[in-house]
A protein has these predicted regions:
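Small-residue helix/turn framework positions
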Residues: 1-16, 30-42, 65, 79-140, ...
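Outer-membrane beta-barrel proteins
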Residues: 17-25, 141-147, 333
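Extended terminal
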Residues: 22, 239-241, 254, 277-283, ...
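Flexible, surface-exposed loop regions and adjacent strand-edge segments
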Residues: 50-53, 116-121, 171-175, 210, ...
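Anion-recognition interface
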Residues: 59
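Structural motif
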Residues: 62-64, 183-184, 255, 295, ...
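Extracellular beta-strand scaffolds
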Residues: 66-67, 188
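Long, charged amphipathic helices and adjacent flexible linkers at domain junctions
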Residues: 360-373, 446-456
Length: 539
C-alpha cells in the first residue's frame, strides 16, 4: 500500500476491528478492515508500468485482501473507467497477485507506449512503432507481485481511422480499423481489419501463434500496389523492366529473431519487359514469392519467379553489396554460397544474347558505380541453343569467373570452344582465344542469292569494342580452313583490322583493313599480301 498509492485526497474513511481482545487469541478470532473513499489519487501498480492518475474510487483493505474500485482515472493520456483492482490474500507459500480489470478510451500511441515500455516482454517486438488515433477497449491483468514471474495480460481494443507506423519493415498504415486482442501468452491478434497501405485499401487479419515467454504474431494482408510505389518503399532507385499493379498477399511474422516478411503474388496485371522466356504481358500472370528476415546482423532474402528463376541472398543489414547469394535461372533452386558476391547459375533451353544486351544497356548503362558488376562474383550456364551476333551455338556451357582486373569467360559448345577475357579498364581490348570454331559447310546445291539482304547491314561498326582474336582451328564443315588471328580497334569512322593473319586452306592472308560508315551505308577496305605454297594443295 505504501508504494502503490503515491498520493490522493481522502474524502472519508474508517477503521474496523472485530474480534477477541485477548492477547493470545488465534488470528482467526480477529478481523481488521480499512476503507477509504479517495479522489485525485495516483497509483503505481508495479515498477516499469505508467502511473494511473486522477483516480476517483474506493479502497477496501480486508482479511481477504485489498480491493480498489475506481470509477475513473487516467493512464498516460488515456481515460480509464470502471477499474477493479484486487490483491487477494495469498495462502502461505504462494505469491500474491495484482488483478486488474477495467475499460479505457484514448489514443493508439498510449497503447504502443505500454507495449514498448512496460515490463511484459514485448519491448523488442514493438520497438520503434508509432501510432495515433482513437483507441477503446478493456483490459484484464494478472500481475505477480513476486520477482521473476511473468504477468498475464489480455487487452481487447478497437481502432477507427487510426494510423500505425511499423518500424521494421517500415510500413505506414492509415485509416486503420479493426478489432484487436493482445494476449501476453500468445501475442497480438485481430480481425475485421481494414486500412490503407501504399496509398491503396487493404484487408487484414492478425494471428497470435506464440506461447508464454515466446510471443509470435502473424499479420496477413491483401491488397494491390503499383510497381513504382513498391520500389520506392524498398528504396530501389535503379529502373526495372517491370510495370503495372501488383496484387499481393503480405505476411509479416513478428517472432523475435525469427521475424520475417513474405509477399506472394500472382503477378496478374504486371508487365515484365524481359526477353523470352522471362517476360510476360500484364494479362498473363506468374506465381511469385518474396521472403526476407527482419532481425539479426545478417538478413536473408529469397525470391521465386514461377518455375523460371530462384534467388537467395544474405547480407549485413543496410550493406546489400557486401552480401552473398545466387540467382538460378531455369527450373531449380538457388543455393546460398559461402563466398561474397552474387553467383548466377542456370539451365536454359534457349537464350538470345541480342535482346539481353539491349536490356542491359537500357537498365544498367547508367550505373555510375558499376554496383551490379561489383556484386557479381561468377556465372555458370548450360544452354541448349544460344543465339547472338548472327550465330547459333548448340549445347553450350558458359562459365564466368572473376580475375584481379578482368572477367574470364569460358565457352564450350558444338560450334566453338575457348576463353574470353573481359578487362575492367575502359577501352582495353577484349581477348578472345578459341581452340576451334566450326562453321557450317557450304551446300553446293544451293545457289547464292546476290540480292539476299546483307547480314551485317544493321550493325554499326563504331559500336564494336576493341578485340584481340585468336582461333587455333577454323573449320568449314569437315574441312580445316586454318588458324586466324587479328586485332580490331575502334576509330573515329569505324573499325581498323590490324595484324591480320588468316589461314585459308593453304593460303595465308596478311595485312590490315578497315570497316567504316553508318549501318546500311558502310564500306570496307584491305591492304596486304596473299601467300601460298603448293598451288595444287590450295586448289
Amino acid at each position: 500500500m505504501r508504494t502503490a498509492i503515491l498520493k490522493g485526497a481522502v474524502d472519508q474513511g474508517f477503521f474496523q476491528y472485530q474480534g477477541s481482545l485477548n492477547h493470545d487469541a488465534l488470528p482467526a478470532a480477529r478481523n481488521i478492515s480499512l476503507f477509504f473513499k479517495v479522489h485525485d489519487a495516483e497509483l503505481a501498480f508495479q515498477p516499469g508500468w505508467p502511473h494511473v492518475s486522477k483516480v476517483n474510487g474506493e479502497v477496501f483493505v480486508e482479511e481477504s485482501g485489498v480491493r480498489i474500485l475506481a470509477s475513473k482515472g487516467q493512464l498516460l493520456d488515456t481515460k480509464v473507467k470502471d477499474v477493479y483492482v484486487n490483491i487477494p490474500h495469498a495462502p502461505a507459500g504462494k505469491d500474491s497477485h495484482l488483478l486488474i480489470t477495467g475499460g479505457f478510451a484514448g489514443g493508439l500511441g498510449d497503447g504502443l507506449k505500454i507495449l514498448q515500455d512496460a515490463p511484459i516482454g514485448t519491448g523488442s517486438t514493438f520497438a520503434g512503432w508509432k501510432g495515433e488515433g482513437d483507441l477503446q477497449g478493456k483490459l484484464d491483468l494478472d500481475i505477480p507481485l513476486a520477482k521473476g514471474t511473468e504477468p498475464k495480460i489480455v487487452v481487447d481494443f478497437k481502432t477507427d481511422k487510426a494510423r500505425l507506423q511499423l518500424a521494421e519493415p517500415t510500413l505506414d498504415l492509415t485509416q486503420l480499423k479493426g478489432d484487436f486482442r493482445f494476449d501476453s501468452a500468445k501475442g497480438l491478434s485481430g480481425q475485421n481489419i481494414s486500412a490503407k497501405a501504399f496509398d491503396r485499401p487493404i484487408t487484414a487479419q492478425i494471428l497470435a501463434d506464440g506461447k508464454p515467454g515466446s510471443l509470435s504474431t502473424r499479420v496477413i494482408a491483401k491488397g494491390q500496389v503499383t510497381v513504382k510505389r513498391l520500389t520506392d518503399w524498398l528504396k530501389i532507385s535503379q529502373p526495372l523492366p517491370v510495370s503495372g499493379d501488383i496484387p499481393y498477399q503480405l505476411q509479416v511474422t513478428l517472432d523475435g529473431a525469427d521475424s520475417q516478411l513474405m509477399v506472394s503474388s500472382t503477378m496478374k496485371g504486371v508487365a515484365v519487359d524481359l526477353p523470352a522466356p522471362f517476360g510476360m504481358p500484364a494479362s498473363q500472370g506468374r506465381d511469385s514469392v518474396f521472403r526476407m528476415t527482419l532481425q539479426g546482423a545478417e538478413r536473408r532474402y529469397w525470391f521465386s519467379y514461377g518455375e523460371l528463376a530462384s534467388f537467395t541472398f544474405a547480407a549485413p543489414a543496410d550493406k546489400f553489396n557486401d552480401g552473398r547469394g545466387e540467382l538460378f535461372l531455369g527450373n531449380g533452386d538457388a543455393v546460398l554460397p559461402a563466398a561474397k558476391g552474387l553467383r548466377i547459375r542456370g539451365v536454359l533451353s534457349e537464350l538470345d544474347i541480342d535482346p539481353w544486351k539491349k536490356l542491359v544497356d537500357r537498365y544498367a548503362g547508367n550505373d555510375p558505380g558499376g554496383s551490379a558488376k561489383q556484386l557479381l562474383s561468377g556465372a555458370d550456364f548450360k544452354v541448349g541453343k544460344l543465339t547472338g551476333f548472327g550465330t547459333q551455338f548448340d549445347q553450350v556451357t558458359l562459365q564466368l569467373d572473376r580475375k584481379p582486373t578482368a572477367w574470364g569467360l569460358q565457352l564450350d559448345s558444338q560450334q566453338a570452344k575457348g576463353t574470353v577475357n573481359l578487362p575492367d579498364a575502359k577501352g582495353a581490348p577484349i581477348a578472345i582465344n578459341l581452340q576451334y570454331v566450326k562453321l557450317p559447310a557450304v551446300d553446293p546445291t544451293v545457289q547464292a542469292d546476290e540480292n539476299a539482304p546483307d547480314p551485317l547491314a544493321d550493325i554499326d561498326p563504331k559500336e564494336i569494342p576493341a578485340l584481340d582474336i585468336a582461333i587455333n582451328q577454323l573449320f568449314q564443315g569437315p574441312d580445316l580452313v586454318g588458324a586466324w588471328s587479328l586485332k580490331i580497334r575502334p576509330t573515329a569512322k569505324g573499325l581498323a583490322f590490324n595484324n591480320l593473319d588468316l589461314g585459308l586452306k593453304g593460303m595465308q592472308l596478311k595485312g590490315a583493313g578497315g570497316w567504316e560508315g553508318a549501318p546500311g551505308a558502310s564500306s570496307s577496305w584491305y591492304r596486304g599480301r596473299l601467300d601460298g605454297k603448293n598451288i595444287a594443295d590450295v586448289l
